[in-house]
Amino acid sequence: MGILNVTPDSFSDGGKYNNIDAALLHTKEMIEDGAHIIDIGGESTRPGYTMISDEEEIERVCPVIEKIKNEFDIPVSVDTYKSRVASAAITSGADLINDIWGLKYDDDMAAVISGSGLPCCIMHNRNNTDYSDFIKDLNKEMLESVNIALNAGIDRDKIIIDPGVGFGKEYIHNILCLRHLDEFCKLGYPVLLGTSRKSVIGLTLDLPKDERVEGTLVTTVIAVMNRCMFVRVHDVKQNYRTIKMTEGIYGRNSN
């Protein structure tokens, strides 16, 4: 899953692709580099981000969705936690909704997705880091999101889960997410891992965000070895080659 941030303020690439021509060029590059899905974000979710209105997010995202769907044959995911944005994105041609609040922020989100018949990715997130038993608590809270989806009528086979590295977690929690990826795969849903250039890598290696590719690639190997189905990344070419080499040695879904 290649990341396309059409924002002026995303933590890693804010301002690079927030016009349609630049977004289309980057999409073309990511497809050529091996991306199977393009994930479009119209609002930065970096630590300390400023929330924007539904209307502004729709204006950023929907024209890009329409252009990509007109010019390329690739599924488009939209990274939003707002039901109005999701509805507009679906109308514009989105193929998947990626909700960083696991359907818990907007009470209408699950119904919008259910009505569309599209798949969704539901990420673990919370407003504090006060865990009593981290992995147990995380699994419980992810399954709460899954139940919201199921109760809204979203098909079980259209649900993807994401442990939410970097969201509602301290450094050690992010490390534990990576150390125990197999626990999330045991829940019975496809798992997406998003670690690309994140602070857990920067803190481990003491490197700025533009020097975290190698650290990201290590987490991608871990994802493949633990049967994750998706990795959400900025550096598509390097990650695609890493996945291909890992699968060449161990086979696809080797565990």
Task: Give the label of every model feature segment.
Residues 25-41:
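Catalytic domains of carbohydrate-active enzymes, especially glycoside hydrolases
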Residues 31-35, 145-158:
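Phosphate/pyrophosphate-binding loops at sites that engage ATP/ADP/AMP, CoA/4′-phosphopantetheine
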Residues 164:
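Conserved Motif II region of HX4D acyltransferases
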